[in-house]
């Protein structure tokens, strides 16, 4: 999955993107944009973030994301993951602090690819 970051045209859906510059949902979004990645913010409380249209959920996207990146608390991430694993999404990435044993067990039971021990900002090179 980390290899898919090398192709900057691959779509990354960022669940928990934020306009709050103090939150990692903002820092990660701006970092990926600055590195030339194709990223869309997912946040039902925002219309736009960093000048990009914000979507309420991943299912609203017209293109299937290559990676769904989570920067939300584990309890929220788990609820969203429960819905997403039943759809045709394969690659899930949980930022440090967004992961949980419950999420990992769910993803393992559905044979989904996931990363829960690395920061996407570190792994996404310029």
Residue ranges and their predicted role:
Residues 1-45, 50:
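Hydrophobic, well-ordered beta-alpha structural blocks that scaffold small-molecule cofactor pockets
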Residues 1-5, 117-126:
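C-terminal helix-to-coil terminal segments
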Residues 27-28, 79-84, 103-106:
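A short acidic, amphipathic alpha-helical/loop segment
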Residues 37, 87-91, 110-112:
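A short helix->loop->beta-strand "cap" motif at the edges of active sites that frequently abuts
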Residues 52-57:
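Conserved SAM-binding strand-loop segment of SAM-dependent methyltransferases
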Residues 58, 62-98:
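Mid-chain, well-packed structural core segment of small domains
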Residues 96-123:
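Rossmann-fold NAD(P)-binding glycine/threonine-rich loop
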